[in-house]
């Protein structure tokens, strides 16, 4: 009862082909809905959903469920505008900032499969993730801050794109204040630009065993 279902499952476990088990396989839901919308439906929209507290920059901020859903549903619309649909893959190569959370939940909202790659990872490692995932869009930031240094992401991303055999169709880059970088249109656009004409979108219905994300170990 704690999980929202568009269609409640009648079968809990399919164990006919172990070890490839399927859970709730006839159920239909959405992980973004269960992370955000359900809490708003239950009257908790004004409660805090996300706290950002950076020990490097000292920046602090809080987002309610309503605020976070608004950001997520609009960026989900921005992804749609860039051609991302259900089943498409999106690589998220970002520092630990609120926009990274927004990007992940936005993918879940529209049924896209996200793959988080540690921000600052070497170009060859990022290239291998691009090739393996066959990502349509890469979401990144201009830089990341680590103790005693700034890691410029754009050169790393540019090199990874050159190295990868699979070519992404679009890059969406979040410009960090004071560390803005030049973008090459039309394949590269800023986070803010992607949102300029985007409309908020609702959650798509997902079968329980459809992919949500790719996590490399």
Locations of regions flagged by a protein language model:
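Glycine-rich adenosyl-nucleotide cofactor-binding module
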Residues: 47, 52-79, 196, 200
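Adenylate-forming
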Residues: 36-40, 68, 72, 90, ...
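Conserved pre-ATP/AMP-binding loop-to-beta segment of ANL
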Residues: 46-48, 171-174, 184-216
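Conserved AMP-binding/adenylate-forming
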Residues: 22, 78-127
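Structural preference for long, well-ordered alpha-helical segments in enzyme cores
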Residues: 31-35, 72-75, 103-104
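AMP-dependent adenylate-forming
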Residues: 35-64, 174-182, 212-214
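Flexible, non-catalytic linker and terminal segments flanking ANL/adenylate-forming cores
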Residues: 1-35, 39, 175
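Structural core segment of the AMP-binding/adenylate-forming
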Residues: 109-193
């Amino acid at each position: 009862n704690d999980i929202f279902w568009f269609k409640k499952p009648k079968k809990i476990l399919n164990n006919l082909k172990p070890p490839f088990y399927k859970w709730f396989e006839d159920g239909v839901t959405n992980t973004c809905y269960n992370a955000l919308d359900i809490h708003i439906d239950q009257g908790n929209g004004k409660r805090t959903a996300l706290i950002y507290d950076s020990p490097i920059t000292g920046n602090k901020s809080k987002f309610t469920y309503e605020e976070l859903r608004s950001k997520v549903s609009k960026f989900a619309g921005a992804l749609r505008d860039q051609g991302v649909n259900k089943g498409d893959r999106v690589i998220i190569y970002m520092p630990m900032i609120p926009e990274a959370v927004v990007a992940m939940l936005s993918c879940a909202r529209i049924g896209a499969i996200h793959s988080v790659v540690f921000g600052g990872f070497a170009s060859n490692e990022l290239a291998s993730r691009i090739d393996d995932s066959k990502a349509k869009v890469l979401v990144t930031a201009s830089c990341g801050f680590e103790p005693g240094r700034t890691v410029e992401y754009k050169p790393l991303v540019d090199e990874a794109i050159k190295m990868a055999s699979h070519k992404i169709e679009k890059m969406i880059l979040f410009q960090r204040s004071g560390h803005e970088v030049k973008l090459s249109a039309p394949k590269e656009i800023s986070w803010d630009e992607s949102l300029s004409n985007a409309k908020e979108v609702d959650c798509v219905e997902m079968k329980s065993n459809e992919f949500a994300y790719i996590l490399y170990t």
